[in-house]
Amino acid sequence: MTYKMKKEYAFWATVCLLLSLVPEFLNALSEEADDTDSELGSMKPLHTFCAMKADDGPCKAMIRSYFFNMYTHQCEEFIYGGCEGNENRFDTLEECKKTCIPGYEKTAVKAASGAERPDFCFLEEDPGLCRGYMKRYLYNNQTKQCERFVYGGCLGNRNNFETLDECKKICENPVHSPSPVNEVQMSDYVTDGNTVTDRSTVNNIVVPQSPKVPRRRDYRGRPWCLQPADSGLCKASERRFYYNSATGKCHRFNYTGCGGNNNNFTTRRRCLRSCKTGLIKNKSKGVVKIQRRKAPFVKVVYESIN
């Protein structure tokens, strides 16, 4: 009996001790919450998922993405692995701001007349080191226009835009946008390889013009076929083929095994099948002499009238 009373007394003593500690525990939680609120600031994001931490996921890709940082109240860049993760992940900085920052108003960044473009607009096309296939846009300083290119999925440079509209707003000057030019098609010419003749002026006479120099816009195929041969970054030596848009042929080169670009084929046949179809090519092998069509001969018969 005495043992049972002692056990009961110990139980109630423990309960009383725990109850006495509850107020202190609640005060500690309140102080911690106050510290967290002061650290995060008074701004609340528009959506609860904006408060999640950046999650790159379990995969190993390197995709530039953006997340909202609750501590800095800003959208920041991070590298996404390519799978899983959470909803606090955006493809563009502007999308992140519009989704998570209260009161953010979209401001169209336009290059005013005479205004300087950002330095990264003048960077060369850089598809990066990965072998993905992502449609992106870059500003071409030679044509003064935004053009489509294929991004590999990692690294590269800042002259890389998700949409054509975004590229134009940041890098393209609307005042100096070139007016459409009537491009001369190869079908308007006949050639023997050295002499180019205007088809419209041919009338039993071949009028020589200056030779037509191959230009980049004469190619209408896959964009990676215009990339130069890139042997990559590793130390292997594998026989590969790349398409030369200037000659219209596939040439052999040594590939080191990693990196490089998409203008990389295991066989010459695959190279030609993938890239040759985009070349605007003149199929005639000699000077075509065009004669004016003569009127049909009509025989007139005169009969005497008696």
UniProtKB/Swiss-Prot annotation:
The record, for PANTHER family, names: BOOPHILIN-H2, KUNITZ-TYPE PROTEASE INHIBITOR-RELATED
BPTI/Kunitz inhibitor domain span: 50-100, 121-171, 225-275
Q: What is this protein called?
A: Tissue factor pathway inhibitor
Range of residues in the leader sequence: 1-28
Swiss-Prot/TrEMBL keywords? Blood coagulation, Disulfide bond, Glycoprotein, Hemostasis, Protease inhibitor, Repeat, Secreted, Serine protease inhibitor, Signal
Biological processes annotated in GO: blood coagulation; cellular response to steroid hormone stimulus; negative regulation of blood coagulation
Q: Where in the cell is it found?
A: Secreted
Task: Tell me what organism the protein belongs to.
Answer: Mus musculus
Q: What is the lineage of its organism?
A: Eukaryota, Metazoa, Chordata, Craniata, Vertebrata
Task: Tell me the GO molecular function terms.
Answer: serine-type endopeptidase inhibitor activity
* Disulphide-bridged cysteine pairs: 50-100, 59-83, 75-96, 121-171, 130-154, 146-167, 225-275, 234-258, 250-271
Keyword Transferase set for record: no
Please verify whether the record's keywords include Repeat. yes
User: What's a Pfam family this protein contains?
Assistant: Kunitz_BPTI
